[in-house]
Structure formats: structure tokens, C-alpha cells
Amino acid sequence: MGKFTYDINRYEPKQMVALPLCLLILSVIFLAFNTVSTGMPVEPGIDFAGGVAVTLSTSDSVDVIEDYFADYPLKISESDVAAGYLVFNYLEGDSFKDLTEHITARYPDATIYQMGETFGKTLQSQAIWALLFAFVLMAIVVFVAFRIFIPSVAVVLSAFSDIVITAAFMDVFGLTLSLGTTAALLMLIGYSVDSDVLLTTRLLKRQGKVDEKFRGAFRTGIIMTTTTLAAVVVMFIVFSLGQVTLIRDISAVLIIGLIIDMMNTWMLNAGLLKWYVKKGGK
């Protein structure tokens, strides 16, 4: 890693865990406020909330498109509108028929897709259960693998923090919770645990000085994460230029999550493990 080294002796455990824990607490408060206000911690996309999705190819500006649909419940997202992807609130009967006629009158080649509210809520429930089930299974595997309480809790807490903080940033950046972004969060559970398990395994099951084991784990772990991050950034750029919103949103969530994971692994998890070792844990 050249001159970029990881000095575990530079900070005390309390200093290492302070920033990740503050961000985690703020994220929990933010998501809880959203849940009380809207019923969901992150704004649901059309997959979960229901609505009308329209894909069209046009040279019209964002302002022109917004003006044309001023009488309809268009959810404004300039990046999506500029890419020719429009989302409207759920409409029934004559309202949906009027919208369809209004769209085809100006954009005859547009693709129109409607998701029902009831089916969307069913998918929403299934996605939440999938996230919970995946996280619980991950926690069980970690506890079975290490069989030591504090290090296992550190890994699980780090992964939990990754998901919660990433979800908060999703809402800040206007990324909705959809089937695609839910899949990204599921992938993030696996990505985040990799470096945590590497660090914990190196520290608990290898011989040598503690600071050397930390540095060795850091060199390997940071290479793993940055190479994955580089690939995901390229994916984000390519599919943003290609206006493929689903893959763009998946890669955006992964970029946020991987950056958060580096903080949680090498500050939160490492800080807890350092405290555990200083207290005499092996």
C-alpha cells in the first residue's frame, strides 16, 4: 500500500468508534422519523408504492416535459426525467386512461407500465422480510464461525451499521427503495461482512503482534474493497450515460455502502476488537 499505512496504535478504541457510532445513531433517528412521517424508512419506488412508469425517447427538455404533465401527479426527479423515465402516482380507471391518452398524443412510442398498490405492498413486505432473513442468517453464521461473543457482535454491528447508514444516505440522495435497490442492500450484507470477517480472523486466529496483524488485514481488506468499488463506479458511470436507471441505482447504493463499509470495518469493528484485545481477549 506504499506510504498509506494503518496505525492501530494511533487512536484509542473510544476515538475509533466515535464517528461510526454517531453516524449510526443519527441514521437511526433519521429513518425512524421517516417511518413515523411516511410509514417507510426510505421512500418506496414504484415497485413497492404502486404507480405508473413511462419510458420515452425524446429531445424535450426537463422543463418542457414537466409543463406538459403539469396536470398529472408526476414525481419529479430531474435525472430520471432527463433520461426519459417518468413516474406518476398510482391512478385508477378514467384517470389512468386520460394519462395514457395524454402520453401517446405527444409520445406515441412511449412504453407505459402500471403497478397496482396492493401488489406493490406485497412486494414491499417480501423485500423487508428478505433483508431481515438475510441479516439474521448472516449473524448466525458469524456467531457459529467465531463462537466468541464480543468479536461476533463487532462484525454484526458493523454490518448492521453499513445497512442503516446506507439506507439513510439513499433517502438523502433521492434513491428510492425498489426491487433493484433492495437487491443492492442484500449484496451489501455480503460485501460488508467480507472485510469484517477477514479482520477478525487475522486478529484471533493468527500468531504475531497485534498491530502487525491489523496492518496485514488492512492491506488485504482495503485492496478487496477498493477493487470492488472501482468496478462498481465504472458500472455506475456506464449505466448513467446509457440511461439504465435500474442498474444505475443498484451501483449507486453499492458505492455508498462500500464507502460506509470501509469506515465501519476499520474504525468501528477494529476499535471494538482493539478494546477486546486490550481487555485480555484472545
From Swiss-Prot:
InterPro entries associated with the record: SecD/SecF_arch_bac (IPR022813), SecD_SecF_C (IPR048634), SecF_arc (IPR024921)
Compartments where found: Cell membrane
Oxidoreductase found in the keyword field: no
Keywords: Cell membrane, Membrane, Protein transport, Translocation, Transmembrane, Transmembrane helix, Transport
4Fe-4S in keyword set: no
Domain of life: Archaea
Residue spans crossing the bilayer: 16-36, 126-146, 148-168, 169-189, 221-241, 253-273
GO cellular component, one term: plasma membrane
Gene Ontology biological process: intracellular protein transmembrane transport; protein targeting
SUBUNIT field: Part of the protein translocation apparatus. Forms a complex with SecD.
Role, per record: Involved in protein export.
Protein name: Protein-export membrane protein SecF
Source organism of this protein record: Methanolacinia petrolearia (strain DSM 11571 / OCM 486 / SEBR 4847)
Gene: secF
